[in-house]
Regions:
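GHKL (Bergerat-fold) ATPase N-terminal catalytic module, capturing the glycine-rich phosphate-binding loop
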Residues: 26, 33-40, 96-100
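Conserved beta-strand-loop-beta-strand hairpin that lines the nucleotide-binding pocket
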Residues: 1-4, 49-136
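Conserved ATP-binding N-box helix of the HATPase_c
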Residues: 31-58
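Generic alpha-helical secondary structure
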Residues: 15-18, 32, 36, 40, ...
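Helix-loop-beta hinge of the Bergerat
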Residues: 2-31
Protein backbone atom coordinates (compact mmCIF):
# COMPACT_ATOMS: atom_id res chain seq x y z
CA UNK A 1 0.00 0.00 0.00
CA UNK A 2 1.25 3.52 -0.82
CA UNK A 3 0.90 5.33 2.52
CA UNK A 4 -0.97 8.63 2.60
CA UNK A 5 -1.42 9.29 6.30
CA UNK A 6 -2.58 8.01 9.65
CA UNK A 7 -4.65 9.14 12.61
CA UNK A 8 -5.01 8.14 16.23
CA UNK A 9 -8.70 8.63 16.93
CA UNK A 10 -9.20 8.74 20.69
CA UNK A 11 -11.60 11.59 21.44
CA UNK A 12 -14.18 13.88 19.85
CA UNK A 13 -11.58 16.34 18.55
CA UNK A 14 -9.46 13.73 16.76
CA UNK A 15 -12.62 11.97 15.55
CA UNK A 16 -14.00 15.13 13.90
CA UNK A 17 -10.63 16.17 12.49
CA UNK A 18 -9.92 12.81 10.90
CA UNK A 19 -13.46 12.52 9.51
CA UNK A 20 -13.15 15.91 7.78
CA UNK A 21 -9.81 14.91 6.30
CA UNK A 22 -11.15 11.58 5.01
CA UNK A 23 -14.03 13.44 3.34
CA UNK A 24 -11.61 15.86 1.64
CA UNK A 25 -9.29 13.02 0.63
CA UNK A 26 -12.18 11.18 -1.01
CA UNK A 27 -13.10 14.31 -2.96
CA UNK A 28 -9.48 14.79 -4.07
CA UNK A 29 -9.39 11.18 -5.27
CA UNK A 30 -12.39 11.74 -7.54
CA UNK A 31 -15.31 10.47 -5.49
CA UNK A 32 -18.49 12.46 -6.12
CA UNK A 33 -20.28 14.15 -3.23
CA UNK A 34 -22.38 11.09 -2.45
CA UNK A 35 -19.45 8.66 -2.61
CA UNK A 36 -17.22 10.91 -0.50
CA UNK A 37 -19.96 11.35 2.11
CA UNK A 38 -20.61 7.60 2.24
CA UNK A 39 -16.90 6.95 2.79
CA UNK A 40 -16.76 9.53 5.60
CA UNK A 41 -19.88 7.96 7.15
CA UNK A 42 -18.43 4.44 7.04
CA UNK A 43 -15.14 5.74 8.47
CA UNK A 44 -17.08 7.49 11.26
CA UNK A 45 -19.12 4.42 12.14
CA UNK A 46 -16.02 2.25 12.36
CA UNK A 47 -14.06 4.79 14.41
CA UNK A 48 -16.98 5.10 16.84
CA UNK A 49 -16.40 1.48 17.82
CA UNK A 50 -13.04 2.36 19.34
CA UNK A 51 -13.01 6.08 20.05
CA UNK A 52 -14.20 5.86 23.66
CA UNK A 53 -11.97 2.93 24.60
CA UNK A 54 -8.51 3.36 26.11
CA UNK A 55 -6.06 3.54 23.21
CA UNK A 56 -8.75 4.55 20.71
CA UNK A 57 -8.43 3.36 17.12
CA UNK A 58 -5.48 3.96 14.82
CA UNK A 59 -6.31 4.39 11.15
CA UNK A 60 -3.92 4.23 8.19
CA UNK A 61 -4.92 5.48 4.75
CA UNK A 62 -3.22 4.58 1.51
CA UNK A 63 -3.62 3.62 -2.11
CA UNK A 64 -3.30 0.05 -3.29
CA UNK A 65 -2.90 -1.30 -6.81
CA UNK A 66 -5.81 -3.61 -7.64
CA UNK A 67 -6.92 -5.31 -10.84
CA UNK A 68 -8.63 -2.55 -12.77
CA UNK A 69 -6.92 0.39 -11.06
CA UNK A 70 -6.13 1.93 -7.71
CA UNK A 71 -8.18 1.45 -4.55
CA UNK A 72 -8.28 3.51 -1.38
CA UNK A 73 -7.20 1.37 1.55
CA UNK A 74 -8.20 2.20 5.11
CA UNK A 75 -6.75 0.16 7.96
CA UNK A 76 -8.48 0.22 11.34
CA UNK A 77 -6.42 -1.00 14.31
CA UNK A 78 -8.60 -1.17 17.40
CA UNK A 79 -7.08 -1.23 20.89
CA UNK A 80 -9.58 -3.88 22.04
CA UNK A 81 -11.93 -6.41 20.53
CA UNK A 82 -14.87 -4.59 19.01
CA UNK A 83 -16.31 -7.56 17.19
CA UNK A 84 -16.48 -7.67 13.41
CA UNK A 85 -17.68 -4.26 12.22
CA UNK A 86 -20.84 -5.09 10.25
CA UNK A 87 -21.23 -1.68 8.60
CA UNK A 88 -17.99 -2.17 6.69
CA UNK A 89 -19.23 -5.01 4.50
CA UNK A 90 -22.03 -2.81 3.21
CA UNK A 91 -19.62 -0.13 2.06
CA UNK A 92 -16.13 -1.37 1.24
CA UNK A 93 -15.58 -3.63 -1.76
CA UNK A 94 -13.39 -5.74 0.49
CA UNK A 95 -13.15 -5.67 4.30
CA UNK A 96 -10.91 -8.26 5.89
CA UNK A 97 -8.96 -8.94 9.06
CA UNK A 98 -5.27 -8.07 8.77
CA UNK A 99 -3.28 -11.28 9.32
CA UNK A 100 -1.16 -11.24 12.46
CA UNK A 101 -2.69 -8.02 13.78
CA UNK A 102 -5.23 -8.46 16.56
CA UNK A 103 -8.44 -6.46 16.14
CA UNK A 104 -7.25 -4.91 12.87
CA UNK A 105 -9.09 -4.70 9.56
CA UNK A 106 -8.45 -3.34 6.06
CA UNK A 107 -11.18 -1.86 3.92
CA UNK A 108 -10.60 -1.39 0.18
CA UNK A 109 -12.68 0.81 -2.07
CA UNK A 110 -11.80 1.18 -5.77
CA UNK A 111 -11.36 4.74 -6.97
CA UNK A 112 -14.23 5.85 -9.22
CA UNK A 113 -11.86 6.78 -12.07
CA UNK A 114 -10.18 3.56 -13.21
CA UNK A 115 -7.68 5.67 -15.17
CA UNK A 116 -6.64 7.71 -12.11
CA UNK A 117 -2.90 8.30 -12.18
CA UNK A 118 -0.87 9.21 -9.15
CA UNK A 119 2.23 11.35 -9.66
CA UNK A 120 4.72 12.53 -7.02
CA UNK A 121 3.26 16.04 -6.85
CA UNK A 122 -0.27 14.77 -6.19
CA UNK A 123 1.01 12.18 -3.71
CA UNK A 124 2.83 14.85 -1.69
CA UNK A 125 -0.22 17.12 -1.82
CA UNK A 126 -2.49 14.36 -0.47
CA UNK A 127 -0.02 13.50 2.28
CA UNK A 128 0.30 17.16 3.25
CA UNK A 129 -3.49 17.57 3.48
CA UNK A 130 -3.70 14.66 5.88
CA UNK A 131 -0.68 15.67 7.96
CA UNK A 132 -1.57 19.29 8.66
CA UNK A 133 -4.42 20.49 10.90
CA UNK A 134 -7.67 21.52 9.24
CA UNK A 135 -8.45 25.21 9.13
CA UNK A 136 -11.98 24.77 10.44
Amino acid sequence: MIPLGEFLVEDEVTFNESRRKVLRLAQALGFDEIGATRLAMAYSELCRLGVDRPGGVRTHLGLEEQPGGLALGVDFAFSANTGAPLVADAFFRSFTAIPGAAWSYRGLLPLPDHCFRLDEELLESLRSRLAHPSRE
